[in-house]
């Protein structure tokens, strides 16, 4: 689920994109801002936004909101990645390629980027129909907030494309249920080039994964894992000597 079909992508000019990458918002923070600034905005009452769109967006943000103390299983993490917007274009491509479109269409309605693009389209249409005297700064700010959210998701997508292009680890953002302060876990994934590989069989490939946690009792912890179809090797690195000795 993490990768688009094996096609040769267009090359991204790193020098053009690099200045914009620091402006992207981590997924966990973005979800909180959308819940507050979009779903909680009084502007919604004056815009003719379809109730189903708002309900779909609310459900998606609920899935992407960390639940403190509740550790998601693999199915829930897969759902979070699928709904985060990073694979929106791949789903659109799949929609046009498949003859049975109802399943893919349903997935598109549950995709965060797709929902924000639809909300932006509805908002712009409503703004054009409003008399000029009814336009105010709050409506303009709302429209800009939706645009910035879409831009942030697209910058994360570009970052993933650049990582692949530069042979760097792919980074997946996952809601962090372990820390109320840091709402996003960055999961770094790289195909294992040293293990036995079958280039024609995705199911037989090995991957190296790593993520970092900042825990109140243990300090900073790095979790490394080598994952294959029949093996899982996990190691931990800590910065405190007493924790390592334990």
Predicted regions and their residues:
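Extended non-catalytic alpha-helical interaction modules
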Residues: 1-246
């Amino acid at each position: 689920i993490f990768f688009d079909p094996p096609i040769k992508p267009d090359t991204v000019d790193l020098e053009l994109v690099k200045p914009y990458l620091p402006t992207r918002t981590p997924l966990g923070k973005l979800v909180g801002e959308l819940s507050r600034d979009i779903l909680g905005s009084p502007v919604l009452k004056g815009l003719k936004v379809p109730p189903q769109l708002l309900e779909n967006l609310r459900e998606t943000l609920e899935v992407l909101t960390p639940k403190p103390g509740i550790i998601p299983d693999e199915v829930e993490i897969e759902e979070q990645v699928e709904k985060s917007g990073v694979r929106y274009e791949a789903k659109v491509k799949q929609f046009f390629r498949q003859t049975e479109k109802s399943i893919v269409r349903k997935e598109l309605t549950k995709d965060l980027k797709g929902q924000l693009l639809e909300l932006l389209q509805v908002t712009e249409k409503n703004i054009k129909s409003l008399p000029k005297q009814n336009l105010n700064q709050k409506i303009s700010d709302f429209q800009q907030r939706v645009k910035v959210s879409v831009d942030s998701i697209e910058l994360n997508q570009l970052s993933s494309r650049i990582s692949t292009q530069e042979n760097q680890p792919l980074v997946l953002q996952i809601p962090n249920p372990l820390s109320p302060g840091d709402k996003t876990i960055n999961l770094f994934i790289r195909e294992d080039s040293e293990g036995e590989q079958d280039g024609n069989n995705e199911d037989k490939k090995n991957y190296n994964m790593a993520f970092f946690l900042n825990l109140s009792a243990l300090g900073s912890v790095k979790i490394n894992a080598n994952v294959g179809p029949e093996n899982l090797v996990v190691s931990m690195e800590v910065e405190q000597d007493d924790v390592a000795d334990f």
